[in-house]
Curated annotation (Swiss-Prot):
Pfam families (UniProt xref): LRAT
Gene: Plaat5
PROSITE patterns to which the protein is assigned, alphabetical: LRAT (PS51934)
Catalyzed chemical reaction(s): a 1,2-diacyl-sn-glycero-3-phosphocholine + H2O = a 1-acyl-sn-glycero-3-phosphocholine + a fatty acid + H(+); a 1,2-diacyl-sn-glycero-3-phosphocholine + H2O = a 2-acyl-sn-glycero-3-phosphocholine + a fatty acid + H(+); 1-hexadecanoyl-2-(5Z,8Z,11Z,14Z-eicosatetraenoyl)-sn-glycero-3-phosphocholine + 1,2-di-(9Z-octadecenoyl)-sn-glycero-3-phosphoethanolamine = N-(5Z,8Z,11Z,14Z-eicosatetraenoyl)-1,2-di-(9Z-octadecenoyl)-sn-glycero-3-phosphoethanolamine + 1-hexadecanoyl-sn-glycero-3-phosphocholine + H(+); 1,2-di-(9Z-octadecenoyl)-sn-glycero-3-phosphoethanolamine + 1,2-dihexadecanoyl-sn-glycero-3-phosphocholine = N-hexadecanoyl-1,2-di-(9Z-octadecenoyl)-sn-glycero-3-phosphoethanolamine + 1-hexadecanoyl-sn-glycero-3-phosphocholine + H(+)
Lineage: Eukaryota, Metazoa, Chordata, Craniata, Vertebrata
UniProt protein name: Phospholipase A and acyltransferase 5
Organism of derivation: Mus musculus (Mouse)
């Protein structure tokens, strides 16, 4: 008689984990008497293997309370010196625990793999767009997970929106993760279709020559996007500012149109 798939569901118990009671030895006299009695009454004898099989089938449908009783019996047998039955099969929680990296090398390797899966690994000269709250910060990738970017002179202002209103900036060589401040990022060489990038060695030379220099900063004419585009293409350009100016012009035009409409004399109706 086969078991349905539901038997191995919530109320199923793996038989390998349940310590079955040891069969007691029956004397030959009692065995003979029982066989004679069964023969006299006309009942057939049931082999022990069939009884154990029936018991195994019933165990599949035992409620949770009986499961707990089985576990208590297993604990008592362990305390009495009996060797508990162990299963070599790993549970999902054990599998997850074993996959967690423990050593520093494993952690660093995992982080690098996750970074590669989330974003392609940058190459020297690639532009990095960092999505901060309210604006996008830009940097240029150099080597060994390090970038060069414009930053305010005060470290307290780094990563803050107030940094975009400063009139000075310092060119810094920093680790990418230190520049992110928990923000997301991506490689964005979007002007490659408009301008031909300079040779990589020239980009790197120009970039390294700017490190630690203090430069004039202007949100409209010389921000971080102007800076990295100038290093890669030789053209200081910021599409972020261009889009803002276009949207501002549209908004100003809409306001002006509304004002003109409001002051325009209306025709008198009879």
């Amino acid at each position: 008689m086969g078991l349905s798939p539901a038997a191995s569901g919530e109320f199923g118990i793996r038989l390998s984990r349940v310590p079955w009671p040891r069969p007691t030895q029956i004397s030959k006299t009692s065995s003979t008497e029982s066989s004679d009695t069964q023969s006299a009454t006309g009942q057939s004898t049931v082999p022990h293997s069939d009884s154990a099989s029936s018991q195994a089938l019933l165990v599949q449908f035992l409620p949770k309370q009986l499961k707990q009783d089985r576990r208590l019996e297993q604990a008592r047998s362990f305390q009495q010196g009996e060797k508990p039955e162990t299963s070599l099969e790993l549970t999902p929680s054990k599998k997850r625990t074993e996959l967690i990296p423990t050593s520093n090398s494993e952690i660093e390797s995992t982080q690098k793999n996750q970074a590669v899966e989330g974003n392609p690994r940058p190459r020297p000269g690639d532009l990095i767009e960092i999505f901060r709250i309210g604006y996008e910060h830009w940097a240029i990738y150099v080597e060994d997970d390090c970038v060069v970017h414009l930053a305010p002179p005060s470290e307290f202002e780094a990563g803050s929106i107030t940094s975009i209103f400063s009139n000075r900036a310092v060119v810094k060589y920093s680790r990418l993760e230190d520049v992110l401040h928990g923000c997301s990022w991506k490689i964005n060489n979007k002007l490659d279709g408009t301008y031909l990038p300079l040779p990589v060695d020239k980009i790197m030379q120009r970039t390294k020559n700017m490190i630690n220099k203090i430069v004039q900063y202007s949100l409209i004419e010389g921000n971080c996007e102007h800076f990295v585009n100038d290093l890669r293409y030789g053209v200081p350009r910021s599409q972020q500012v261009e889009h803002a100016l276009v949207e501002g012009a549209k908004a100003a035009g809409a306001v002006l149109s509304a004002v003109v409409d409001s002051i325009r004399p209306k025709p008198i109706t009879a």
